[in-house]
Amino acid sequence: MHDVVIVGAGPGGSAAAYYLAKQGLDVLLLDKADFPRDKTCGDGLTPRALTVLEDMELLSELLPVGCRLNRVEVASAAGQTVTAPFPGKNGRPGYTLIVPRFTLDDILRRHAITHGAQFQSQVRVTGVTANGKGVEVTGKHPGGSFSATARVAIMATGASVPLLQQMGLLKKMPVVALAARAYFEEVKGLSDAMQLSFAGVPLPGYGWVFPLPHGAANIGAGIFPWGWAGRWLSRNTRQAFDSFIQTPQLREMLAGARQVGQVKGYPLRMDFLTAPTYAERTLLVGEAAGLVNPLTGEGIDYALESGKVAAEHVLRLFASADFSLPRLADYDRLLRQRFQRLFRVCSLTRDLFVNPLLINPMVRLAALRPDLKMVLIRIAFGEQNTLENITVRRVLRRVFAG
């Protein structure tokens, strides 16, 4: 019997495997894919993500293979732009790093293995069953059936929900955001800025240009098809992507550029505020727990952080030899203390301001008010969990007052 079985070798699963194996636990890390493998994503590592990667002693390995960005540039639907430095708050790095998941996830996986985790690929897990002594993980691999037992399981299965539904953790399908991205080479006009744009994309939603080394870029668009906007939003992310790259700015940047590979779409689970995070002998991390920023769609940072939090909690469970449901519920409280208020504020910011009525006035006002600009940037990148005195009434009053 293993100490811990982790299902999913993305950032959350591999981070948990690293922290647990480093402390001497017997850790089995499973994934349905062979590595390295592509993973459709925006590829952005925010200052929050970089803080965990630095703690894992991986930042020096990632810097040479990524593209360091020092600023964020936001364009309104009308095309007005505002630029700000990344907030290096609470001792975090004042920059972001763009690293394709093909590279990032394999580095994280190998790092966990180096520190003692066992890894098995091509395992499609179909069941996780808890009992009084632990969990049994069952599934299939190319050699036939698969089975492993452990004292605790960590689910790091991303946006995929069938296994969580089979386990009884999700009673209904969560509402998801939708995104699509493609890689391009020989892109014009790239700089040290992460570019976010509300032009050409159904609101609430945005397009992005994330530079990569050697003139390449991850370019995509995401939409949030729910609430009042769900009545008129297109749910076709390919249409949103095509509309975004046909904006004047993108046409200029992509003139002569070469698309590498296909446009790939993906869902984003942002339901942390209502999502389950634990069950008997089981913890959920990252997107499996709905931990994707509801304003930006960023999830790598929260996957890494929750992977670390889960590992620390599992170590406490082993130290106390208490794997009871109330002790597992303490993990949920830790996540709520860490992320609940931030996710509420991000959801509120999206719902109040990322709409056709207010997005242009908001960007225009942010260009005039550096304090407002930095509040919004800090909220978007998970560095602030309050809107302070920003309200719709105040924004409209300032805008129409000139």
What are these regions (language model features)?
Residues 34-54:
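Conserved N-terminal glycine-rich FAD pyrophosphate-binding loop of Rossmann-like flavoproteins
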